[in-house]
């Protein structure tokens, strides 16, 4: 039973090329011909996903069958957005601050999406040894959805791999374009 692609062999072939890109890049420092292997990464990426619609997402969760990552993070008190991460996102005007940061609100223990660096709900955990209370500090939206799919391979990961390969090949303008596409795809996801 194929719970990801429902038996679509061409979709699995695209996923296989994406995984080849991932693991070729993962082993790049052991390569005897880095330039050739970086070009292989680019070739594999070109044969893989063309949009987020293609990505390998295990999307079978519901109220009775929660995402295991959510279960893991929700059952532990020590996960929160750190002060240092939050400061870096603010300093760099990183759009992920508004997209992925959730902060606690009132006693109802619901979360709200942060609207920016001036948002009074932006409550990062202090660096060091903060109180272990996930309800007190902000968390990533990606760990706060019990029905979010588990990604085997995402489109934005491929775009990041493409950007890294291009950068290592000193094709900086192409790398910058791929990086911007990767960030946009990741935020949209």
Regions found by a protein language model. Give the residues of each.
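Structured, solvent-exposed acidic/aromatic patches
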Residues: 1-161, 165-188
């Amino acid at each position: 039973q194929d719970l990801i692609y429902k038996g679509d062999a061409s979709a699995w072939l695209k996923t296989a090329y994406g995984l080849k890109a991932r693991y070729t890049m993962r082993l790049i420092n052991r390569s005897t011909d880095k330039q050739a292997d970086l070009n292989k990464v680019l070739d594999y990426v070109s044969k893989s996903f063309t949009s987020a619609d293609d990505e390998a997402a295990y999307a079978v969760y519901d109220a009775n069958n929660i995402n295991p990552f959510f279960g893991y993070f929700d059952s532990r008190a020590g996960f929160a957005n750190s002060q240092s991460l939050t400061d870096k996102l603010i300093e760099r005007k990183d759009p992920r601050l508004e997209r992925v940061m959730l902060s606690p609100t009132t006693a109802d223990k619901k979360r709200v999406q942060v609207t920016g660096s001036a948002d009074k709900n932006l409550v990062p955990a202090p660096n060091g040894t903060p109180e272990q209370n996930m309800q007190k500090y902000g968390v990533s939206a990606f760990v706060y959805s019990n029905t979010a799919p588990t990604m085997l391979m995402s489109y934005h990961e491929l775009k990041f791999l493409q950007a890294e390969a291009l950068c290592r090949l000193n094709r900086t303008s192409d790398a910058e374009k791929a990086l911007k596409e990767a960030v946009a795809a990741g935020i949209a996801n």
